[in-house]
Amino acid sequence: MKNLRKLLHLYLKSIHPRVYFQVAPETAQFPYLVYDFTQITSDGEEFETVAVDVDGWDMPANGNTTALETLMQTVNDALNKKTLTTEGLAVTFYLDRKIPLLDDNKKIRRRKYIYEARLFGRS
């Protein structure tokens, strides 16, 4: 998973400068992205299916979600059906679901896009 994490992190950073794995620091500037691998299923050989969550976070002064929606659309345009490769693996991402999330802090706006990533190991 280390190689997949590194590959995805670099790719998301090419889309948006503030990208974090699992948890953003409390000092993170909005808007930002947080990604995680929530489930990994292996066939026992060189194929794995990975559920990848990409969460967009924003705290707009006026509550308007346009910037967040634009960010998430940009992420999806770049990631959906995209194949990334590095030494030892190739992975293709497919959008599965889009979920608007409510945060305990009513000023924060969130969107979660869940991707099914199909990962192939290479010998």
Where are each of the predicted segments found?
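A short beta-turn/loop motif at secondary-structure boundaries
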Residues: 24-28, 105
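Charged, amphipathic alpha-helical segments and their flanking helix caps
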Residues: 1-20, 36-123
